[in-house]
Amino acid sequence: MNPFVIAAVWLGLGLVSSAVLRRRTARLVALVPLIGAGVTLLATRMSTSAVPLGGLTGITGLDRTGQGVLVAAGISLALVLMLQPSIDVSAGRAIGVVGAAATIAMASNDPLVTAVAIGAAIATLVLRWIDQSPGKATLAAGRVAGTGTAALVAASPFLPLTGFTTGARPVVVGVLLATGVAALLAVYPLGGWATGVIGTLKPADVAPWLVLLVPVVLIIAERIPGGNLGAGTPVYEHVLLIVGLGSAVWGGLWAIRGRTAMRYGRVFMADIALCVAAVEGAPTSPALTGALIIVITHLALAPILLRSEDAGLRWPRRVAWALLSGVPPSPTFWGRLLILEALAAGNIGSTIAAVIAMGAIFVAAVMACSTGIRLTPDHRVRMRVPELVAWLLVAIGVTVGLAPQSLAGFVFGH
């Protein structure tokens, strides 16, 4: 199936759901990402990765990794919506646009098309966030994330850098690309907007960025050095290595000190920052495999941990946090071990920063496991179906921990 058809399915379902569904049937919005993930399985698969630096070759198709990311993220987003206590039907429109844009971005070899597609997704989300909760946090999201997409668009006309492998041009392009990736993935010092959005909006409103768009941008960021950046390659990689490690340490510490309701968001951002630092700072290592293991773990557990603590799922939440703690044989242990191995091959400073970040994430996960929630008997009865789904997701997380590389290879082909 052509990527344009898949994108049209995402967009069409999103528009129809927001126009047709009402409050009683609002939970059917989950069908948008679920069907989108289903049709992505039918995509025409390319044997080579769609590197967004290969020249103006257009949209060629999804490779195995891109297909796996979109399918896993779509299913995870559907489960996030299913487990929410309430859903706004207008979210379907934003989900449809983000899913369509993510499909085009993953299938494109044209850097301008990739940048514009990501920009369309970010613009749609930011406009919805501002409409839902106008204020400093959502306006900051528009400024910073918008600057990130603008940086990618500004860099795209210069790619590939044929004949300009040295001098100022590759360095400027490398800085622009690093700025765009850091802003879109909420890596400090450009990550404050995500913290504000997570603390202001409902989880269902943040989920399209957190569950669907972030994994896509992470994979695209990993592919960027595959093009001919010349002297800009070390600039791009070193900038993301430094800011990624700094962001991971900062996010881990604030996951301990910050509000309980924002703990998962900060842990997620810290893990993604570690992935960015390792994948870009050690591209010839097992870093990508470790990053994919962490991504699939978060996709499996996000539906549980993005649900409000007051809404139940006490024991599944505790087990989910245990799986994120990094204690063996949890899946995050293997993912972070591969990332640490990759960073240790570089220099001692990177290793120390990564160990501090991982230690902070461990402490935050232990604190979350010890949090108690009181539920009335009637509330427990009503929670049977969500708890069943939550335990199923926990079982998937345990399976990832028992066979991390095999399952990551099955999902992402890597």
What are these regions (language model features)?
Residues M1-S86, G92-R93, A408-G413:
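Transmembrane helix-loop-helix hairpins at membrane boundaries of multipass inner-membrane proteins
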Residues M1-W10, I59-A73, N109-I122, A168-A183, ...:
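Structural signature of hydrophobic alpha-helical transmembrane segments
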Residues L31-T40, S47-G54, L79, L83, ...:
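Short helix-boundary/re-entrant hairpin motifs in multi-pass inner-membrane proteins
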Residues V32-T44, I95-M106, G142-P160, A204-I220, ...:
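Small-residue-rich segments of transmembrane alpha-helices in multi-pass membrane proteins
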Residues S47-G61, L161-R169, E222-Y236, W334-L343, ...:
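Membrane-interface helix termini and inter-helical loops of multi-pass transporters
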Residues N347-G372, A390:
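Alpha-helical transmembrane segments of multi-pass integral membrane proteins
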Residues V366-H414:
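Cytoplasmic/organellar membrane-interface segments at the starts of transmembrane helices
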